[in-house]
C-alpha cells in the first residue's frame, strides 16, 4: 500500500508571522519553560556528553541525558541527590538499556526500597515500536505507584504518528505510562538507518501529525513530544517547536561546540590532523586554530563499542570529523535570541503560546535553494 500524501522535512517549510503582533520587542518574550530552561535536550551520544562534561550543559539551561557509554555505577549516582523526591532533579535523565531498565525498575525486589525517591529514566533503544518495551514500562509504572516513588519515563524512537496515539492512550490512574517520547528515526547526522533500511517519516510532518493527534485526544496529561534528529541549525529547532514539539533533542550541533566530550583534533604544521587533550584544545581554540571533533552515531561500530565494548551488530551509524565552530554559551545565547525573535513575530509572549500554535507554509523549490545558501 502506498500512502498518497506528501511528507515534509524542516527545510520544506517556513513559519508565517501573525497578522498583527502585540509584542513590541523580543525582550518581552520568555523562551524558557516552567523549569527556567530552554526546551532542548542534549542527545545521549558519547561523543557529545558524558559524566565529566554534563554540568556545563546543565549550567547553560539545557536538559541532559547521560549516555549508556558511561559506567553503570556512575550513571546511577547521577540520578541526583540520592534520588530523593524532595530534592529531585527535573532536568537530567539517565539512559538505560532495555535490560538495565528491566532489572532496575521491573523487579519488585529491586524497587521496594525506593519510597519517596525520584528517577528520570531514558529507555534508550532504537526501535520504539516494540510491544515488549511498553509492557515493561507499564510494569515499571505500576510498581512506582505501589511503592510510592516518582518514575518519569522517556523512550522511543518512533516514526509513525499512530504509534504516538497508542502511546498517549497508555495510562495508569489517568497518568501517562510514557512521559516523553522521542519521535524521529533515521534523521540524525550520525545515523544511516534510513539509507539502509528505508525506515523514516519526514520530521516536520511527523511532529505536526503527532501534535494534531494530541489536540484530537484532548487528554489532561499527554505524552510530551521530543523531536529527535535532523536539526542542523537554530531555524530547525524553532520550526520543530512551532509544529508542536515540546522539546528538541540535539546531537551533531552540540558536537561542534568546544565543550563536547568527543576527541579533539587539530591540523599540525605538516597539514596532518593530530589528536590533542581537552586542555590543549581550549588553548588552540583561543589562538584561532581550527579544531575538529570526532563524532559518531551511537548505532555506529564506534558507538556500539562505546556501549558494549565490542561491535555487536551491523552498524547503522557513521563516524566523521566535525569542525568546532563555537563555545556552548554563545550557541545558547544565539538560540535564545533567535527563538525570542521568532516568538515576537508570531505574537507569543510565552513559550506555551508558541509551541504547536503556528502556521507554516510549504516553500517552492527555488525558495528552498535560496534558504540553503
Each model region followed by its residue ranges:
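Active-site entrance/lid segments in N-terminal catalytic domains of soluble metabolic enzymes
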Residues: 1-224, 252-254
Amino acid at each position: 500500500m502506498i500512502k498518497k500524501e506528501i511528507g515534509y522535512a524542516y527545510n520544506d517549510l517556513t513559519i508565517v508571522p501573525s497578522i498583527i503582533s502585540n509584542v513590541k520587542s523580543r525582550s518581552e518574550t520568555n523562551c524558557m519553560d516552567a523549569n527556567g530552561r530552554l526546551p532542548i535536550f542534549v542527545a545521549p551520544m558519547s561523543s557529545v556528553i558524558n559524566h565529566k562534561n554534563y554540568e556545563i550543559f546543565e549550567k547553560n539551561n539545557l536538559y541532559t541525558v547521560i549516555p549508556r557509554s558511561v559506567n553503570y555505577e556512575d550513571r546511577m549516582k547521577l540520578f541526583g541527590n540520592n534520588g530523593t523526591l524532595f530534592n529531585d532533579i527535573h532536568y537530567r535523565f539517565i539512559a538505560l538499556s532495555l535490560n538495565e531498565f528491566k532489572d532496575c525498575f521491573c523487579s519488585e525486589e529491586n524497587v521496594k526500597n525506593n519510597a519517596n525517591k525520584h528517577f528520570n529514566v531514558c529507555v534508550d533503544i532504537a526501535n520504539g515500536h516494540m510491544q515488549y518495551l511498553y509492557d515493561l514500562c507499564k510494569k515499571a509504572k505500576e510498581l512506582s505507584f505501589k511503592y510510592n516513588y516518582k518514575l518519569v519515563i522517556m523512550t522511543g524512537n518512533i516514526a509513525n504518528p499512530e504509534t504516538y496515539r497508542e502511546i498517549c492512550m497508555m495510562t495508569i490512574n489517568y497518568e501517562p505510562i510514557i512521559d516523553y517520547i522521542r519521535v524521529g528515526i533515521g534523521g540524525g547526522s550520525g545515523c544511516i538507518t534510513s539509507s539502509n533500511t528505508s525506515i523514516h517519516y519526514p520530521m516536520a510532518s511527523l511532529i505536526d501529525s503527532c501534535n494534531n493527534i494530541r489536540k484530537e485526544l484532548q487528554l489532561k496529561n499527554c505524552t510530551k513530544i521530543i523531536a529527535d534528529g535532523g536539526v542542523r541549525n537554530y531555524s530547525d529547532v524553532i520550526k520543530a517547536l512551532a509544529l508542536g514539539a515540546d522539546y528538541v533533542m540535539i546531537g551533531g550541533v552540540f558536537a561542534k561546540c568546544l565543550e563536547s566530550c568527543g576527541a579533539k583534533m587539530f591540523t599540525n604544521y605538516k597539514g596532518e590532523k593530530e589528536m590533542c587533550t581537552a586542555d590543549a584544545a581550549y588553548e588552540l581554540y583561543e589562538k584561532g586554530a581550527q579544531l575538529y571533533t570526532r563524532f559518531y552515531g551511537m548505532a555506529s561500530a564506534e558507538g556500539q563499542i562505546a556501549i558494549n565494548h565490542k561491535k555487536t551488530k551491523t552498524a547503522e551509524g557513521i563516524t566523521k570529523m566535525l569542525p568546532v565552530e563555537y563555545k556552548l554559551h554563545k550557541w545558547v545565547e544565539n538560540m535564545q535570541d533567535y527563538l525570542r525573535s521568532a516568538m515576537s513575530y508570531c505574537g507569543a509572549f510565552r513559550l506555551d503560546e508558541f509551541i504547536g500554535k503556528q502556521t507554516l507554509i510549504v516553500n517552492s523549490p527555488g525558495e528552498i535553494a535560496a534558504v540553503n545558501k
